[in-house]
Amino acid sequence: MTALMIQGAGSNVGKSMLVAGLCRAARRRGLTVAPFKPQNMSNNAAVTADGGEIGRAQALQALACGLEPVTDMNPILLKPESDVGAQVVVQGKRLTTTRARVYATLKPQLMGAVLESFNRLKATHDLVIVEGAGSPAEVNLRAGDIANMGFARAADVPVVLVGDIDRGGVIAQIVGTQAVLDPADAEMISGFLINKFRGDVTLFDDGYRLIGARTGWRGFGTLPWFPLAHKLPAEDALDIASGPATGGTVIACLTLSRIANFDDLDPLAAEPGVRMVMVQPGQPIPAEARLVILPGSKSTRGDLAFLREQGWDIDLAAHVRRGGHVLGICGGYQMLGRSVADPEGIEGPAGTTPGLGLLDVETVMTPDKRLTRVRATHAGSGLAVEGYEIHIGRTEGADRARPFAIVEGQNEGAMSADGRVIGSYLHGLFGADAFRAAFLRGLGIRASGQSHAAGVEAALDALADHLETHLDVTGILALAR
């Protein structure tokens, strides 16, 4: 038993959650198991203990394995900065920023780093469960591929193909994938499974048998929709919006065009007394919102312009006049100030963009990136806060004399004179249960008193139980070689 790979017949078929569940199931069998994703594209990154960054999904999968996340679990991370360009992070460290066409020429060189990381994990664990990216059916991207079949063949890892029945056409998804694949790539697929079924699973029995007959592949089962999916940290901002939509006090978060590291929202969204609303482009900020969150952004000045295009600057000013609260985290903190200057053109064309003016601070972008885990003390309550920083730029100004937190004896963040507008560089701050409860009380919201970490662990166990009930998990794990 060495490794197996989960690939999708399309994007967003549930690969990340399936890998997390399989990792927990394998761990409960007494195996040492590690997750691995050769290439991920996401602005929702996790900071590793060794000071690197990987996709947030792989950090959750590491938790399912009982491991600390390390950069080898996601050696290539692409962080989009525009519609055509992305930052390339290799084994946790920024390599370059490039356009898609240029990146295609880099991929063959990056396969070495991918295999190096994979082999390190393979040498120290009984099992490595690999997650593909997108779909191998995108055969126009096959040349130089390091994320799907290119990796599977280079590392000789068997593949299970996942189809998403919720979006319809799952027979065509799976049979069609086999039809367009190069025969040598198709031979890497050992079986298939169906994900996200709603209703009576037996109604798909004929379709399930048809897929097996057409492809010759072994079926590993049909998995019903996992009802506790919203209890797990979200990989996509839209996943947060898919949680319970009724009841609770409204906390609104702006869905910026380059939203990043929005895992700050997960502990809040899990609170029964909170209704998290992701404000979509073109929508007004809800007037009933008790708190408005400006999240992290991969392009602060670009998202400031985007925010104004939606009219959210006007909504925010009205929200503050009504006595509402505002929290800006990382890029959102930078936006709250009087200006954001980028004299070297690090995030785009050089220049200065006026901020929202809700905090008396100014930010200057600098080339050096701060990437570290943080233990802090909340300045207002004295409660412990843990999180991480992942940003460029320095923020200074009068409101920093009223800090959000104290980090190693230094002021962190800023607060307005009336205490209703707060900015901080600390991501993950609401994972601290006592602080989260105190913060919510300050908004007039009763906290559940539950441990967020314990809730995530329970959801991972429930996910593994769900897979064990409906899939041939033993058969899937037995494919590893």
UniProtKB/Swiss-Prot annotation:
Biological pathway: Cofactor biosynthesis; adenosylcobalamin biosynthesis
InterPro entries found in the cross-reference section: Class_I_gatase-like, CobQ/CobB/MinD/ParA_Nub-bd_dom, CobQ_GATase1, CobQ_N, CobQ_synth, GATase_3, P-loop_NTPase
Gene Ontology process terms (BP): cobalamin biosynthetic process
Family statement drawn from the similarity comment of this UniProt entry: Belongs to the CobB/CobQ family. CobQ subfamily.
Pfam family, one: CbiA
UniProt KW GTP-binding keyword: no
Record: active site: 330 (nucleophile), 427
GO molecular function terms attached to this record: ABC-type vitamin B12 transporter activity; catalytic activity
Name by which UniProt lists this protein: Cobyric acid synthase
Domain GATase cobBQ-type residue range list: 248-435
Keywords: Cobalamin biosynthesis, Glutamine amidotransferase
Domain of life the protein comes from: Bacteria
Function statement: Catalyzes amidations at positions B, D, E, and G on adenosylcobyrinic A,C-diamide. NH(2) groups are provided by glutamine, and one molecule of ATP is hydrogenolyzed for each amidation.
Taxonomic placement: Bacteria, Pseudomonadati, Pseudomonadota, Alphaproteobacteria, Rhodobacterales
